[in-house]
Design a protein with these regions (language model features):
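Non-heme di-metal
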Residues: 4-155
Length: 155
């Protein structure tokens, strides 16, 4: 599998860590949980930026993003509680970070002597996305504490 194909997976692949999966999941959750929906929507907007940038990069590599292989079966929107949704999202963000870090390492291994210009751009893009995903983990972790406190009051 070439690097461009791995970017397709990150972009809209039928995997839980794709940007399209994240966009759909967060926007669906926004409608399910009014009290924390705006946070989910804010994160979804950032995921949309990732989706856009990855699509641009795939185009720069000569790929086309007009024929998605996406399946909505990767999206989970049935939850017992807001706390469960937040936990699922934290894990998805962590899994996404790990997937992008693996992709960065693969790019480096494929360019052991000197990074090509496209490899350098790819790593910069992925590092920016990883940074954003780490912010999402922090935001969601804080949200998890808040939701747990709220749900504890209701019990």
């Amino acid at each position: 599998m070439c690097i461009r194909d791995r970017f397709y997976d990150a972009y809209y692949g039928a995997i839980p860590t794709s940007e399209l999966t994240a966009i759909i999941q967060y926007t669906q959750q926004r409608m399910l949980f009014e009290n924390i929906g705006e946070t989910f929507l804010g994160i979804a907007f950032v995921e949309m930026k990732h989706f856009d940038r990855l699509g641009d990069f795939i185009g720069q590599l000569g790929g086309r993003v007009n024929t998605p292989k996406y399946s909505s079966s990767a999206v989970t929107v049935e939850y017992e509680s807001a706390a469960e949704a937040v936990r699922v999202n934290i894990q998805a963000e962590k899994d996404t970070i790990a997937a992008y870090q693996q992709l960065i390492e693969r790019i480096r291994k494929n360019n052991p002597e000197k990074l090509t210009q496209s490899a350098t751009v790819a790593i910069q893009l992925l590092n920016k996305i990883v940074s954003d995903e780490r912010v999402h983990v922090r935001i969601l972790s804080e949200l998890a504490q808040s939701v747990a406190a709220e749900e504890g009051k209701e019990a």
